[in-house]
């Protein structure tokens, strides 16, 4: 059976895993790393770069590099411009997914068409739909969208058998934060509540360090660096490195030589010490936000910290000592550390993929919707149909009516959020139901049904009970894409894949040609009298032809001249090999004869003459 890929599509890093022999296995990327930076860029030559190679060139090419695109998933009007072309967040995310898919296929030696992709528990409908669209553009059928904390609990609890446990999952990633309360038992993973912030993560901690460095440099040198993209990229890398180092040491040095040039033309360097205490002070309000979400999640699940059996930390940012201390102080429990926080979510996604593919038995995942769903009613009131933390999939319906006599149609305004006033919530869509027969206000009965599927994506259905007429309403989600747009983007992605393949082939052809030239020149030098002058001149001519072809851009010409050089070198290489073989055999034979004679026997060299063809005649 074909493998289903489990993907943690992260803000700063992504990870992939599959089920192998009943276990979830994290797959390395082409560079050998188990995580891939969620960075996309284009080189100055127009080559698409994804992952570590994109991150490496960001300092010298910041305007053609994009980070943390996940923060903009579901934003209808957000676009990025790379290499003169605009892209949606879905397309950028698809490039990351495409890299993971391609490299998983290369590692496994088989085609992958299906995936389970994780999202923050607090992602709304538009963000989930955008993630699914990104998978489609990358050529993946997304079988399921699951919440990241839930995936982490699967990674933790798969081997825990029938032990009943209540778990708090604290997930602080690069750009998002979630906390979920789950109950495990008998193979059932039931989410009781979830809370979080889709715009809070490790990036925000990095930004505090960047702001500090900018302020310190301005204070000491009187220069504002905040407008220079290349310098900001260097500061971003330095801030991230400092944050990571401060998890293991109490002070770190940020040293960036030749950062800029002063008014007098003298180079300016940055050399600033940052202590862990300073770092914790400048980020304490960010940690306080996570505490608010933990309190809310526990309150919604009707549990107290004392009721918890385990606390799991997920996401690279949870390595910060202040995070560990905060969670431990709040829950009264030491966090469970037997799971790699960078890999737990991908492992959980692979387990869910195994459930869907039939490889994993006796596991049932019951997730919840993170936000209340409802519609706007008379007076701008938000009337809920599905409350937050309702187990999904679920379907709820309610009867509504007209607000005026003989009203021929009603507009239904679909909302997501916790506020009592419609305008304070997020609009998921609007639709109008026409053809209502004339009647006094309050008489027509319009049934509106909300249906949330297992991916947490909303579908709405409306029915006029008076006429029996039923309509399925398709909400145009903010940030969602039409089938035609997805199809166009799929073709664009395929086109890029072909371009990448062609460019790779061109590079390999040129590399092979240059290697052959070096080998041929070495062969000529070492050939001696094994090669005739005619053979040598043919090889030298073929070398010059190939060098000339390499100066141009015609790959086919390079291939042809490479083959010609191979043909010219072949007879010489063959002759050299045969000579070496004969010499080895001769040496072996002489050694054998000497051994047979013993030490006292005289060795007599025989005179011989090489008879050429002319003398034979």
Curated annotation (Swiss-Prot):
Name this protein carries in UniProt: Chaperone protein DnaK
Family annotation (HAMAP family): DnaK
Alphabetical list of InterPro entries matching this protein: ATPase_NBD, Chaperone_DnaK, Heat_shock_70_CS, HSP70_C_sf, HSP70_peptide-bd_sf, Hsp_70_fam
Bias (Low complexity) ranges: 580-594
Family: Belongs to the heat shock protein 70 family.
Residues in coiled coil: none
A GO MF term: ATP-dependent protein folding chaperone
CDD domains referenced in this protein's UniProt entry, alphabetically: ASKHA_NBD_HSP70_DnaK-like
NCBIfam families according to UniProt: PRK00290.1, prok_dnaK
Keywords assigned: ATP-binding, Chaperone, Nucleotide-binding
Function in brief: Acts as a chaperone.
GO biological process: chaperone cofactor-dependent protein refolding; protein refolding
Domain of life where this protein originates: Archaea
Record organism: Methanosarcina acetivorans (strain ATCC 35395 / DSM 2834 / JCM 12185 / C2A)
Pfam families in the record: HSP70
Database matches in Gene3D superfamilies: 1.20.1270.10, 3.30.420.40, Actin, Chain A, domain 4, Substrate Binding Domain Of DNAk, Chain A, domain 1
Compositional bias of kind Acidic residues: 602-617
Disordered, as annotated region: 579-617
